[in-house]
Amino acid sequence: MSERTRLGVVLLFMRITIFVVMALWTIDKFVDPGHASHVYEAYYGLGGFGVSPIMLIAVVEALILLVFDAGRLKFWTYGFVVIVHGVSTLAAWAQYLDPFAGPNLLFFAAWPMWAAAIALFVLRERDIYTLGRDTR
């Protein structure tokens, strides 16, 4: 197997696994918008979101993630994932200060995923196993 093929397979696996995690958080917005509203208030300081704004965010996020999973519009969709996951990771800064309290240790799993998303963005031109031809 050539280096190009091996790298392509690794990047495909990274894209799919990042998509799965992000998709679950998006599905959570549809299934339990109250939970998403609580997360926005607790971690981002954005309170007062009702069901409609959460659903709108979920729809937009779902559409972007589907395009991301297909490996299309790489600069924009891969960049979106890096930014959204980065903001989410950094917003939980207080949990990193006390890693052994409650479920805080789980928050550290966000760091390698963010690193994977950054690597995927940087290597996006080498991500060759996509649906259709990417015209950016």
Show which residues each predicted segment covers.
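Extended, low-polarity transmembrane helix blocks
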Residues: 1-31, 51-59, 63, 69-136
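Membrane-interface interhelical connector segments
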Residues: 30-46
